[in-house]
């Protein structure tokens, strides 16, 4: 696992220094002489990346996602093109085109592309063509710039993976499609009638689930179901290209997955084509390879065992409480068993110095030169982010700049050149995709819109959640009880006791509690108020009648400063409430807990210490001035 930039935890040593020049190394071979007396041993020079801050300024950095948009079903993949278009697909066969704008994204077009789940998509090297394949045995080709479907090929088999394998400017738009039930790979002309130009049946022995094209070196890399990796040329006779630095696979580390009995879920090339990254299951390793030599030079351990050990040792980059960590661990195990595991991926940034991928803790940005985690995106979110794609363009940028424009001091021109780095992510079992930017949600105080955009008709479950959230906002989640002895701040629990909270907040807003006294105070036990008669015999709910008890397993009378409803027996709640000053567990399942004091405990104890008469009523009235709901 890569190190946190703020810690000094030891990591697995990288297999090769990516920055080292041939013939140079940080380590000398053989034993070293001890340093002269009085001198410290020479320290190794730390690896650094020149201008790292400049690179980081062009990457997202927010703890939370800024916005999310919907599909009708669970999303499978998201892809970004160089021409500022975003493509999203879902398991119900739907495809959507979006356009990156200065303020976010805009919806462009929606296709019911396939009758079944979209298995894989591929964008051509010139970012002009999109190919999609589905379990409905069809291959569809789209013109990305014009958002049009320009070809449909009916396949005679169930496809597994798809990839454009032609370079920019090439006459034929070649696309490779693998079969799900055998090792065949078929090559088609994406603009033709669908008859295969070639069929490769001996390249692999098992079904191929990953095909990627390195346009710089005109080489295809394919991976099969047992982790075997093959390099081949996209032209007949489809042999090993001549421009590689090896002749035999035994000279490389391409057998690594077969040795470890693990299978990659992705293979992503760096922008310069010199490296590629993989993520794999079940060993959960992130590996980086030199493309020309096929040698592995980085390996990051993201296994559940490693993460659990770091959590227990307190050395994780973001420590979670035990309950949240256990929940995320369960989600990881569920993800590995699901079909969505095949969409787990890693991507490079434009500089090729950083790799970005989802993990249990959030989305990690790792500096592969220094082996440090430089940023953890979405660490405050509960989602498990799966498929990611990075945008690093300037959405306002003009196509052509004149010399006069460049030389001018035009503020609008400078603004048009500003980058808006955005990471687009899908999440496990979610019908939304998420945008991670350099902005936290609602950084703009004038922004009133929700960050979860309902661009599709929500399901019943989502409508219920939205209604609950809206109800919580109306009721309020905190209150300040202003008394003649001082202010008491409290947090409310609308989820656990919705009726009690609604009753309390409505009474408070209507001024019902204003000038009421604390009529019952018992030292070491509690302070009670809310009776309009001041003797504990009165008070009614906002509905006129008593309302039922609301007991919760999560919120009990197990600690002081618990705010609970007073009653005269089961289901007799009115307006009176009390605040405990000690654990009072015998009150559980007898009184409804609806809040806890978060500040002003000294005020509570001040009221508790007041002198009282035989009926436990303070000799000097202590009044509620008003209650502020927030």
UniProtKB/Swiss-Prot annotation:
Segments forming domain PPIase cyclophilin-type: 475-629
CDD domains documented for this protein: cyclophilin_WD40 (cd01927)
EC number: 5.2.1.8
GO biological process: protein folding
SUPFAM superfamilies: Cyclophilin-like (SSF50891), WD40 repeat-like (SSF50978)
MF term (GO), any: peptidyl-prolyl cis-trans isomerase activity
Protein name: Peptidyl-prolyl cis-trans isomerase cyp15
Organism, scientific name: Rhizopus delemar (strain RA 99-880 / ATCC MYA-4621 / FGSC 9543 / NRRL 43880)
């Amino acid at each position: 696992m890569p190190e946190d930039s703020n810690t000094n935890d030891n990591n697995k040593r990288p297999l090769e220094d990516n920055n080292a020049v041939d013939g140079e190394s940080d380590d000398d071979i053989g034993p070293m002489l001890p340093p002269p007396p009085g001198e410290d041993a020479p320290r190794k020079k730390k690896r650094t990346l020149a201008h790292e801050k400049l690179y980081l300024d062009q990457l997202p950095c927010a703890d939370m996602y800024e916005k999310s948009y919907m599909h009708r079903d669970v999303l499978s993949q998201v892809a970004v093109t160089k021409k500022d278009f975003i493509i999203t697909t879902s398991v119900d066969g739907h495809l959507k085109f979006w356009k990156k704008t200065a303020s976010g994204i805009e919806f462009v077009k929606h296709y019911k592309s396939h009758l079944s789940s979209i298995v894989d998509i591929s964008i051509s090297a010139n970012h002009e063509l999109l190919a999609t394949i589905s379990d409905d045995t069809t291959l569809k080709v789209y013109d990305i710039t014009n958002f049009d479907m320009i070809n449909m090929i009916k396949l005679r088999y169930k496809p597994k993976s798809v990839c454009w394998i032609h370079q920019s400017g090439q006459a034929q738009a070649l696309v490779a499609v693998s079969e799900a039930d055998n090792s065949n790979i078929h090559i088609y002309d994406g603009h033709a009638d669908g008859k295969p130009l070639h069929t490769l049946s001996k390249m692999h022995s098992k079904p191929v689930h990953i095909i990627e094209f390195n346009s710089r070196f005109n080489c295809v890399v394919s991976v099969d179901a047992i982790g075997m990796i093959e390099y081949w040329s996209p032209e007949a006779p489809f042999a090993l290209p001549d421009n590689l630095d090896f002749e035999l696979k035994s000279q490389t580390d391409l057998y690594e997955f077969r040795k470890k009995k693990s299978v990659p879920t992705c293979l992503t090339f760096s922008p310069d084509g010199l490296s590629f990254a993989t993520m794999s299951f079940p060993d959960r390793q992130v590996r980086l390879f030199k493309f020309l030599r096929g040698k592995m030079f980085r390996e990051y351990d993201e296994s559940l065992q490693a993460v659990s050990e770091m959590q227990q040792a307190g050395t994780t980059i973001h420590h979670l409480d035990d309950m949240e960590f256990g929940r995320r661990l369960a989600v990881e195990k569920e993800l590995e068993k699901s079909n969505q595991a095949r969409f787990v991926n890693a991507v490079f940034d434009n500089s090729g110095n950083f790799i970005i991928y989802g993990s249990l803790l959030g989305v990690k940005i790792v500096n592969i030169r220094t082996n440090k985690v430089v940023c953890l995106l979405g660490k405050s979110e509960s989602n498990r982010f799966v498929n990611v794609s990075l945008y690093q363009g300037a959405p306002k940028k003009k196509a052509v700049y004149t010399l006069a424009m460049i030389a001018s001091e035009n503020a609008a021109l400078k603004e048009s050149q500003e980058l808006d780095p955005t990471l687009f992510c899908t999440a496990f079992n979610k019908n939304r995709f998420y945008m991670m930017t350099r902005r936290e949600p609602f950084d703009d105080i004038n922004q009133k819109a929700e960050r979860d955009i309902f661009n599709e008709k929500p399901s019943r479950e989502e409508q219920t959640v939205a209604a609950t959230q809206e109800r919580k906002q109306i009721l309020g989640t905190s209150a300040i009880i202003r008394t003649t002895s001082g202010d008491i701040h409290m947090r409310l629990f609308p989820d656990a006791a919705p009726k009690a909270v609604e009753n309390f907040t409505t009474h408070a807003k209507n001024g019902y509690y204003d000038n009421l006294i604390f009529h019952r105070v018992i030292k070491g036990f509690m302070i009670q108020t809310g009776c309009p008669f001041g003797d504990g015999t009165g008070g009614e709910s906002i509905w006129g009648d008593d309302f039922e008890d609301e007991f919760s397993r999560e919120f009990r009378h197990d600690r002081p400063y618990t705010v609970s409803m007073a009653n005269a027996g089961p289901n007799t709640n009115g307006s009176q409430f009390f605040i405990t000053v000690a654990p009072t567990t015998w009150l559980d399942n007898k009184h409804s807990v609806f809040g806890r004091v978060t500040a002003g405990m000294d005020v509570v104890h001040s009221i508790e210490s007041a002198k009282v008469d035989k009926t436990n009523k303070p000799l000097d009235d202590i009044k509620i001035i008003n209650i502020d709901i927030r």
